[in-house]
From Swiss-Prot:
InterPro entries: 23SrRNA_methyltr_KL, DNA_methylase_N6_adenine_CS, RlmKL-like_Mtase, RlmKL-like_Mtase_CS, RlmL_1st, SAM-dep_methyl-trfase, SAM-dependent_MTases_sf, THUMP_dom
Main location: cytoplasm
Protein name, per record: Ribosomal RNA large subunit methyltransferase K/L
GO molecular function, one term: 23S rRNA (guanine(2445)-N(2))-methyltransferase activity
Domain of life of the organism encoding this protein: Bacteria
Protein localization: Cytoplasm
Physiological role: Specifically methylates the guanine in position 2445 (m2G2445) and the guanine in position 2069 (m7G2069) of 23S rRNA.
This protein's GO CC annotations: cytoplasm
Lineage: Bacteria, Pseudomonadati, Pseudomonadota, Gammaproteobacteria, Enterobacterales
UniProtKB keywords: Cytoplasm, Methyltransferase, RNA-binding, rRNA processing, S-adenosyl-L-methionine, Transferase
Organism: Cronobacter sakazakii (strain ATCC BAA-894)
NCBIfam families (UniProt xref): PRK11783.1
SMART domains, per the entry: THUMP
Length: 705
């Protein structure tokens, strides 16, 4: 009997133990990442040929204490390597683990290699050669703290490499993990199996191999025992011949079918090629088809199992499409696959919740570094006339109500960009803005009292409901997370796409960028204020401070302003403003753009203007102020500088987003100015639910009696 070790992915150890016991293994002991077991020479070959779950089969040779590199060298050399492989065989060393002495795995591998080579040369035998790519024998050394475990890797390459798949491209799951997913899915061989997002077909091919009694090692051409001195070629041939006979018989007797589809025709062709290599092309049907068009291949029965490893995203921008995909999949399952089983493997439990299905069983496993879950669902038979379950029903109803009210209004007003929803319901703390045929969802950062998982689930529900209510394609939805802005956060880039789209606001054409920044280039709540500026600007010199992308300057120019002066500290936004002006035929000396700190420029300028628009930040750092700028604290100083630039009959439109802002009327009067609160006049229908979104004032010189 030989002591052996089978490694596997985390979470599959118990499943592997059962598999090895069924092959005849004895004294199986589960440890993290694998199973220790005992077996004779026949079992060694049986486990290599038939284990669908093991990553590698190792034959331990011994252990040694490692307190220095010399300890490692001597411990390895103590093994009788000349009885393990011949000097004309090639070998390679795989070393993993570090300690205080061996701090580099390459150095550890070199010391092991030196010890093995020296074991031959000290007996006056030829020096064996190293072949890192395809050695005759692979030595595995694992250093755990101060103990090195030395073993022969009888697998050679990982056992997940069955020989049917092209290894050039990245695959989302390895074959042994795919086999485990199939085993845990509840699918029974002899019943239909469908994968609607099959990729290169791994899940279906592994299932077909199980169903037709085809050994996973049957198509492998290279093994780690080729150079092992104790290798029994005749015994190995017996194991291989038996596997070939069983595979032929299993395929000829199998009556059911497997179905796979994917939206990428090139991937489907690769899946067909893989199935041909595996000898299973005759029982697997592949089709290039999007999940949107998925139908039950056997509507009259029999029932079977749907299995898949659907895509998941690590980037926020990919989530809307994935949420839509999972929501759609859930609806299709309920509508077309009643009575079937469904099993999905995912790194995102939140996405699986978008199915709106209750799982009967679930399993955990590691897919490389990712913590994953497999959930099995029993799909109830479809009831005629049953109403589909709604996601985030309260939110969906409110959005539907707002849409009915605002869509007609926006069309009459001649605007394409407006707010559909603004945290109307406390459980759904988002803003939803429409930009022509696009939608931007901004998630306000949830309070710390809300569990992150619950907040994330609500966001997923909002996205799914928004897509459903608006009938929106997932690629037309942009998701952002908004927090209270401090300092320069509002200028920080989120992405680098550089994609601009043109929208219409009354008679103005404006460019917005929905992805690259937290804001889009157009403050929707100032829409009425911009129209008022256009109506007030005819024949006037117009100044736009803290101009952002210059949309107010565009409206003033279109309203007939004699000149526009647009000032902002950001070169990016000034270039954007210039594009906006040119888009509307506004260019030349009459339309100046100035890059400057607005407060410093204001303090130094001696120009005169008839109409000034200023929308300063609530708080910022500024060279002009000794420390900071606070709009509540410093608005009188701001007005003092603005007064100097304002002509006798001129008007300042002053706006800010400070909640609870109080205008210092007495201080203004002392400056010879007066202010009229026009906030309510500047709030359009889409912001009627949030009357504190901004405050807006008209400031003029006091008239003398």
């Amino acid at each position: 009997m030989k002591a052996l070790f089978a490694s596997t992915a985390r979470g599959l150890e118990e499943l592997l133990k059962t598999e090895l016991e069924n092959l005849g293994a004895q004294e199986c002991q589960v440890v993290q990442g694998g199973v220790h077991f005992q077996g004779d020479a026949a079992l060694v070959y049986q486990s290599l040929m038939w284990s669908r779950l093991a990553s590698r089969i190792l034959l331990p040779l011994g252990e040694c204490a490692v307190y220095s590199d010399l300890d490692l060298y001597l411990g390895v050399q103590a093994i009788d390597w000349t009885s393990i492989f011949a000097p004309d065989a090639t070998f390679a060393v795989h070393f993993s683990g570090l300690n205080d002495t061996i701090r580099n795995s390459q150095y550890g591998a070199m010391k092991v290699k030196d010890a093995i080579v020296d074991a031959f040369t000290r007996k006056n035998l030829p020096r064996p050669s190293v072949d890192r790519e395809l050695p005759d024998l692979r030595i595995n050394v694992w250093l755990n703290k101060d103990t090195a475990s030395i073993a022969i890797d009888l697998s050679g390459e990982g056992l997940h490499q069955r020989g049917y798949r092209d290894r050039t491209g990245q695959a989302p799951i390895k074959e042994n993990l795919a086999a485990a997913i199939v085993m845990r899915s509840g699918w029974q061989p002899g019943t239909p199996l469908l994968d609607p997002m099959c990729g290169s077909g791994t899940l279906l091919i592994e299932a077909a191999m199980i169903a037709t009694d085809r050994a996973p090692g049957l198509h492998r051409t290279h093994w780690g025992f080729n150079g092992w001195a104790q290798h029994d070629e005749s015994l190995w041939k017996e194991v291989k011949t038996e596997a070939q006979v069983r595979a032929r018989r299993g395929l000829s007797e199998y009556a059911s079918r497997f179905y796979g589809s994917d939206n990428d025709a090139r991937v489907i062709e690769r899946a067909r090629t893989n199935a041909r290599r595996a000898g299973l092309a005759d029982i697997i049907t592949f089709a290039a088809q999007d999940v949107t068009n998925l139908t039950n291949p056997l509507p009259e029965g029999p029932t079977g199992t749907v299995i898949s490893n659907p895509p998941y995203g690590e980037r926020l921008e990919s989530e809307p499409a994935l949420i839509a995909l999972h929501s759609l999949l859930g609806r299709i399952m309920k509508n077309q696959f009643g009575g079937w089983n469904l099993s999905l493997f995912s790194a995102s439990p939140e996405l699986l919740s978008c199915l709106q299905l209750r799982a009967d069983r679930q399993f955990k496993a590691k897919n490389g570094p990712l913590d994953c879950v497999q959930k099995n669902y029993r799909l109830a038979p479809t009831q005629p006339g049953a109403a589909p379950a709604q996601i985030a029903e309260d939110y969906a109803n409110r959005l539907r109500k707002n849409l009915k009210k605002l869509e007609k209004w926006a069309k009459q007003e001649g605007i394409e960009c407006y707010r559909l929803y603004d945290a109307d319901l406390p459980d759904y703390n988002v803003a939803v803005d429409r930009y022509a045929d696009w939608v931007v969802i901004q998630e306000y950062a949830p309070p710390k009292t809300i569990e992150p998982e619950k907040a994330r689930q609500r966001l997923f529900d909002v996205i799914a409901a928004t897509l459903s209510v608006l009938g929106l394609a997932p690629n037309k939805l942009v998701l952002k997370t908004r927090e209270r802005q401090k300092g320069k956060n509002q200028y920080e880039k989120l992405a680098q796409k550089g994609e601009f789209m043109e929208v219409h606001e009354f008679n103005a054409r404006l460019l917005v960028n929905l992805t690259d920044y937290l804001d889009t280039g157009l403050f929707l709540d100032h829409r009425i204020a911009r129209r008022m500026l256009g109506q007030m600007s005819k024949g006037k010199d117009f100044l736009n401070l803290f101009s952002y992308t210059g949309s107010a300057s565009v409206h003033a120019g279109l309203g007939g302003a004699r000149s526009t002066t647009t000032v902002d500290m950001s070169r990016t936004y000034l270039e954007w403003a210039e594009r906006n002006l040119r888009l509307n035929g506004l260019s030349g000396r009459a339309h100046r753009l100035i890059q400057a700190d607005c407060l410093s420029w204001l303090a130094e300028s001696d120009e005169q203007f008839d109409l000034i628009f200023i929308d300063p930040p609530t708080f910022s750092n500024s060279k002009r102020m000794e420390e900071t700028f606070d709009v509540q604290r410093d608005h009188l100083r701001l007005m003092k500088d603005l007064k100097r630039l304002l002509r006798r009959d001129g008007t300042i439109m002053f706006s800010n987003n400070k909640r609870g802002f109080k205008m210092d009327h007495e201080g203004l009067a002392a400056l010879g100015l007066k202010a009229q609160d026009i906030t309510q006049k500047t709030l359009s229908q889409d912001f009627a639910r949030n009357r504190q979104i901004h405050n807006c004032w008209l400031v003029t010189h006091q008239t003398k009696d």
